């Protein structure tokens, strides 16, 4: 009887849909500290690779006017 209860408990635990990824893994830093892990990159971001949790590694786009600035 104990084995039956134990098998039932184990099967119920295995039947539950356990989360594979936690929400804490979202917004992790990737890309040598310059980008973020996201499910989908935002419109102002480039996808530069994949994070260890298989999300996209998203780098924010640069403003062209900031890159071509010269001091007067």
Swiss-Prot record:
This is Beta-defensin 104A. Belongs to the beta-defensin family. The keyword Signal applies. One of its GO terms (cellular component) is extracellular region. One of its GO terms (biological process) is innate immune response. Its main location: secreted. Residues 1-22 form the signal peptide. It is found in: Secreted. It comes from the Eukaryota. Has antimicrobial activity. The gene is DEFB104A. Disulfide bonds join 30-57, 37-51, 41-58. Keywords: Antibiotic, Antimicrobial, Defensin, Disulfide bond, Secreted, Signal. It comes from Gorilla gorilla gorilla.
């Amino acid at each position: 009887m104990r084995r039956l209860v134990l098998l039932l408990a184990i099967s119920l635990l295995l039947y539950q849909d356990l989360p594979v990824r936690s929400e804490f893994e979202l917004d992790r830093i990737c890309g040598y500290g310059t980008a973020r892990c996201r499910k989908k990159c935002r419109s102002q971001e480039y996808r530069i690779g994949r994070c260890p949790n298989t999300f996209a590694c998203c780098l924010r786009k640069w403003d062209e006017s900031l890159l071509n600035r010269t001091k007067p």
